[in-house]
Amino acid sequence: MHYAIGQSFLLVTPTQAARIYSGIATGSKVPKLQLIKKIYDHEKNFQAPETFQIDQSLLKIVKNGLEICVDSGTGQAAKLENIKVAGKTGSAEVPGTTGRTHGWFAAYAPADKPEIVIIAIAEKAGHGGTIAAPIAKRILEEYFKISNKPLASNNKPL
């Protein structure tokens, strides 16, 4: 049961989660980790993103679940007014503490034609839906330029 809910010895970095969500968002393309726009091999051939095989009916179920999470589930704090967001909250237990969790929120938007994948993590700060999802929402608002508020105010971090 621990693996099913992402606990125990299951370790995933934010970068790995972002790659997984990119694959879900696009339906098959998993970007390589890179800090540059395109990668070419030594013979100047463009290196296309990796792909993975997934049954399209399963992919549809996963995407639907991610949309429901934001529309009416634990990810509602990341909901945008005119742009559909797909995402999932998570809370990772902190070893050696009682009740302390790292809050996670992984998302992509727009859900029907993804442009951006976000992984928001708030260490030892609480649950994903109450802590990390609002952070992701502010980033999405800034990305899509749908907020008049500055990303951070009063010199306080998000």
Predicted features, each with a name:
Residues 150-158:
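Intrinsic disorder/low-complexity segments
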Residues 1-48, 57, 66-148:
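Active-site beta-strand/loop architecture of penicillin-binding DD-peptidases
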